[in-house]
Design a protein with these regions (language model features):
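Exposed, interaction-prone extracellular/peripheral surfaces
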Residues: 16-18, 28-45, 52, 63-66
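Generic alpha-helical hydrophobic packing signal
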Residues: 21-25, 32, 36, 91-96
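Von Willebrand factor
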Residues: 1-26, 53-54, 72-76, 106-109
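VWA/integrin I-like adhesion module and closely mimicked acidic/polar interface patches used
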Residues: 41-48, 55, 79-131, 135-139
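Hydrophobic pocket-lining residues that define ligand/cofactor binding sites across diverse proteins
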Residues: 2, 61-64
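Mature, Sec-exported extracytoplasmic domains of Gram-positive
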Residues: 7-8, 20, 31-37, 50-51, ...
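Loop/turn elements at helix/coil->beta-strand transitions in domains of secreted/extracellular proteins
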Residues: 5-10, 66-71, 96-102, 121-124
Length: 143
């Protein structure tokens, strides 16, 4: 799943029509294993509001000294977002940090929305429709 450094922080924000409970793992030990279990137990369902999830990610980043990390948001999405790109863009500008928002698309993801988000945040879109694990590894290597 993930291979993290001892200083790395991974924050999981599952979402459908809205963001769900935030899960955090620091380092590469038991917390990361627990995060992996949480991911494995997730089941897709409901709507898709990737912008709200990305906004929550920006809010979470405010809790860290970003100069000590290489921050990035990685969205895994299988649908078309029902949320507002403009609301995300406003919050992104307010944060004042250049945090790339990478996307991994699978299922019926809307590539146009993902490309717009990637272009705005200086990131990329990865295609996970064939191999989600490889797409995720590509994102981690890119950041």
């Amino acid at each position: 799943f993930l291979q993290a450094s001892s200083r790395e922080v991974n924050i999981l924000i599952p979402f459908s029509g809205e963001p769900m409970e935030v899960c955090t793992a620091q380092g590469n030990g038991a917390e990361l294993e627990a995060l992996n279990t949480t991911v494995q137990d997730l089941a897709p369902g409901g709507g898709t509001d990737m912008y709200a999830a990305a906004l929550r990610g920006l809010e979470e980043l405010k809790n860290y000294d970003l100069s000590q990390y290489t921050p990035a948001i990685i969205l895994l999405t299988d649908g078309q977002s029902e949320g507002s790109f403009r609301a995300f863009a406003d919050a992104y500008e307010e944060l004042g940090a250049q945090v790339p928002v990478f996307s991994i698309m699978f299922g019926d993801a809307d590539e146009t929305q993902l490309e717009e988000l990637a272009q705005y945040t200086n990131a990329r879109v990865f295609d996970g429709r064939e191999n989600l694990t490889e797409a995720f590894r590509s994102v981690k290597g890119y950041n």
